[in-house]
Amino acid sequence: MWFVLYIFLALPLLLVAYLELSTFRRRRVLNKFNGPRGLPLMGNAHQMGKNPSEILDTVFSWWHQYGKDNFVFWIGTYSNVLVTSSKYLEFILSSQTLITKSDIYQLTHPWLGLGLLTSTGSKWHKHRKMITPAFHFNILQDFHEVMNENSTKFIKHLKTVAAGDNIFDFQEQAHYLTLDVICDTAMGVSINAMENRSSSIVQAFKDMCYNINMRAFHPLKRNELLYRLAPDYPAYSRTLKTLQDFTNEIIAKRIEAHKSGAVSTNAGDEFTRKKMAFLDTLLSSTIDGRPLNSKELYEEVSTFMFEGHDTTTSGVSFAVYLLSRHQDEQRKLFKEQREVMGNSELGRDATFQEISQMKYLDLFIKEAQRVYPSVPFIGRFTEKDYVIDGDLVPKGTTLNLGLVMLGYNEKVFKDPHKFRPERFELEKPGPFEYVPFSAGPRNCIGQKFALLEIKTVVSKIIRNFEVLPALDELVSKDGYISTTIGLPDAERKKRDPYRHKYDPILSAVLTLKSENGLYIRLKERH
């Protein structure tokens, strides 16, 4: 009896000892980095905050505290290095072996499987090579037609939403637009998300994206086995099944259509597309001399839909929000629209070639991505020891590449809190000092697609509307952005009490979002 009691009492101590010993080497090696002091077992988890917004503020605070350089922090027994050094970024992003994603991406596995976002090793290399032609110039032109069609529907919808000088959340509206575009381009189907917001598939996309963001900051729910005990797990399972069934059904029908040599052209058929969809390209591709199986097709289509929807929603939303606050830049953009398209032709779609001629629009989007990058962090996991810029980084470490910090480094970008698109004509950041779409062999394969969609939507909105802030008083009079992201602690705390309820509260998980929405008004141009 006493023996059993001793064992029972000793187990927690043995567990603590095991966990501490298992991290001993990593702790010893990583001690050379600056970083906040933590507690045994807990690390720095208790210091980081209770939600994604507080965590982002904390990480920025540490970045300032440690000289805007790399630093180490611990989440329990998980070691993390926040990376902003250009030499580190160059090594990591150029590496052919350091390509394993961090554990946070495991939250997407049940939905996405091991597609291009989450796979590694030979599978990733083969699939990357196979998928690259899907973003060829000619295919992007086809995709652009789809973007224009859906943007036209979006403009009509916005006219209704914005009527009567209504203040509305643009981020919420953009979600449905980008969902329509991605389903159309990825699978050749129209789900009409802008019109059918309550449909099961539209709601499933929204619920799944929310679920991934929520679980990322819930230690117990991040564990797949423990999450099965959570009260919201049954709802998650239903959402997952809805998405899987939807995608698999379309893939099966598309395979049959390809086998028969024809795709239905009946009016009203939801599977009709005049142009090649991403799925059609995959069905025409081979790996090791064989066609892709159903599982591989599902993984890559689902991955393309997730990456192409969530990141583009962020990019479009923050760009339009910045239009509302920075009226001088908006006037320059409208002037460019008239110069490129002609004063009397602003009501038509911009062609693929015309979008490429909009140089100030390109500068504006670059500056928008500098201050509000769609992907704020990239996580890589070291499966072996690496020597980076003379430092030993031990096996088992997560490298968090702080892309959102790069835009606020005054050594690279003078006066970083001033929104100034022209800076990209005058200031030339190094290849690893500004990487909103990552860089190197594992850069964002769909970055041209994303930029084309953002430019197409922003261009059409500018031609149809004056974009106004939620309240006139919120227009930036000095060119500075309204968020306190990236400011030193003392200055941020001084400004926080004066933040307006319509100023965005930023949160960062896999993509950058505003927790309180992005509120604007629109005034039709005549």
UniProtKB/Swiss-Prot annotation:
Its cofactor is heme. Its EC number is 1.14.-.-. One of its GO terms (molecular function) is monooxygenase activity. The keyword Endoplasmic reticulum applies. Heme binds at E307, C444. It comes from the Eukaryota. Keywords: Endoplasmic reticulum, Heme, Iron, Membrane, Metal-binding, Microsome, Monooxygenase, Oxidoreductase. It is an enzyme of class 1 (oxidoreductase). It is found in: Endoplasmic reticulum membrane; Microsome membrane. GO terms for cellular component: endomembrane system; endoplasmic reticulum membrane. It is a peripheral membrane protein. Belongs to the cytochrome P450 family. May be involved in the metabolism of insect hormones and in the breakdown of synthetic insecticides. This is Cytochrome P450 4e2. It comes from Drosophila melanogaster.
